[in-house]
A protein has these predicted regions:
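Juxtamembrane transmembrane-helix termini in multi-pass membrane transport proteins
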Residues: 2-62, 123-144
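Membrane helix-loop-helix hairpins that form the core translocation module of multi-pass transporters
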Residues: 3, 33-97, 102, 151-174, ...
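Short loop/beta submotifs within extracellular cysteine-rich repeat domains
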Residues: 18-22, 85-86, 117-122, 133, ...
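Selected transmembrane alpha-helices and immediately adjacent juxtamembrane segments
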Residues: 95-121
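Juxtamembrane boundary at the C-terminal end of a transmembrane helix
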Residues: 182-194
Length: 194
């Protein structure tokens, strides 16, 4: 049961490194200089977005055997590893919403929209298909988002300029490849191959 919380937390925290929502957090922190409403907006947006993604994943998971889900999870980890190596860029449309609303509402809207189709949302779908405790998966993916984004919000421009993002992306990609290997091993076990 603890895996349903800890694995999603780690996976999403790794996937979020250098992601466009992390860049968005940095921009919002620099623009508003009010970290707590921004963090609250991240929590609300992530819970809403990942709850929907988790529901889709739980529904999706009901159609497949454990072996098939392990193979799908392994493929998604490999894809996420490759995706992690590509730096995200923040769209100008997402940054332009900051003028219309305050820090909380701007963050809520911008993060919710930025997460649609993002690798962390896709990871949430796959994790919810894999683990039976949906609420723990959603809490875990939300914690992962916070682990990656809260330091960026609190540190602002200073931390983002000093971090070796290329090295961090490579380490995160390596971690995803390791997770893919573990998932392949579990898929082979579930398929009766080993």
């Amino acid at each position: 049961m603890l895996d349903s919380l800890l694995v999603p937390t780690a996976i999403v925290a790794l996937a979020e490194i250098g992601d466009k929502t992390q860049l968005l957090a940095l921009i919002l922190a620099a623009r508003f200089r009010k970290p707590w409403p921004i963090i609250a907006g991240i929590v609300a947006a992530t819970l809403a977005n990942h709850a929907a993604a988790g529901a889709v994943g739980a529904w999706f998971g009901s159609f497949f055997s454990d072996a098939v889900l392990h193979w799908i999870l392994a493929a998604s980890f490999c894809a996420t590893a490759l995706w992690t190596l590509v730096p995200d860029k923040l769209d100008d449309d997402e940054a332009s919403t900051t003028r219309k609303f305050g820090p909380f509402l701007t963050t809520l809207i911008a993060f919710f929209l930025a997460e649609i189709g993002d690798k962390t949302q896709i990871a949430t779908v796959m994790l919810a298909a894999q683990y039976p405790e949906l609420w723990l998966v959603i809490i875990g993916t939300t914690l992962g988002m916070l682990i990656a984004n809260v330091p960026v919000v609190l540190a602002g421009n200073f931390a983002a300029e000093k971090l070796p993002l290329t090295l961090i992306r490579r380490l995160a990609a390596t971690a995803f490849f390791i997770l893919a290997i573990v998932a392949v091993y579990k898929a082979m076990q579930s398929s009766g191959w080993i």
